[in-house]
Amino acid sequence: MYDSVIIGAGPGGYVCAIEISKLGGKVCIVEKNGFGGTCTQRGCIPTKYLHSVADIVRKMSMSKAYGIDSKFDLNYKILKSKMLSTVTKLASGIELLLKGNGVEIVEGEAEIISSNKVKVDNKILETKNIVIATGSIPVSLAGYDFKEKILSTDTFWNVEELPKSIAVIGGGYSGCEFASILNVLGCKVWLVEMAEMLMPDQPQEIGNTLEKYMRIDGITVLTNSKVEKITEQGILINGQNIDVEKILVCVGRKPNINSDELKKLGIEFNSKGINVNKKMLTNISNIYAIGDITGKYELAHVASKQGEVTAHNIMGHGNEMDYSVIPF
């Protein structure tokens, strides 16, 4: 029997697993979508890779002002291949880290049978504790599923060629980041935000300054605007038809929960995520939840700290989360 079975090998899950092992526990981690979670596979790492390329492109495009004549073509297929290679390398590093610390790895989709049993395919894992670390998934626009034309921040990475034009829906962190990067890489970008300014959860000066420089860079910014309709040609906003090849939805993320499974187990949750206390414990005495699925903060370092706290509680070394010291 394991001291813990952890479902999800993101920055919360794999840190928790390694910490339990270091504290002398027997631990198993289950993963179905690649090691490192959203951050490594579909978030921070590939986005920052694109950002680094965009930074090079921006500098090259400005080089003539400094007396340097340069011409270049962007080959997105090569760029994407290099980016995916970086993701694979980092994910493999996490896998090796887990194995090197004595963590047992099971690949597949987990189903919690009871508070002491987890099923993966036809295999039953018996455990004293369970840690749910299944992360979050993108929120879609009401009435529109993600498909070939409508992309999420997860499915964007499946695109083989950069679109010539794109509408980015949502002017928060992700939307502004994607809009800026894609604009530099040669896409015609429309950035749509329903609030009065970009980054609506930040001071007005930040949103206004950001909008100013985005407009200078050639991005069409539409604030106080809402998508009225999506068509084969593009989108209808404020009564205006905008023709775009792709639509990238960046309106937030939601906990990746199996509500039927949680109800069956009696685990308390709401639309924001699974309810936990400062020990990361649910209302079930041996089931914990960490990371985005708790609805606290969608930050990798928060998930990792939650994983560490959980590991210490599972192994009998009482510990609690202190959210007042989180760097943003």
Predicted regions and their residues:
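Glycine-rich dinucleotide-binding loop and its adjacent helix/turn
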Residues: 44, 134-187, 192, 263-265, ...
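C-terminal catalytic lobe of FAD-dependent flavoproteins
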Residues: 242-266, 284
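N-terminal Rossmann-like FAD-binding beta1-loop-alpha1 element of flavoenzymes
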Residues: 3-29, 175-184
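Short FAD-binding loop at a beta-strand-to-alpha-helix junction that anchors the flavin cofactor
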Residues: 278-297
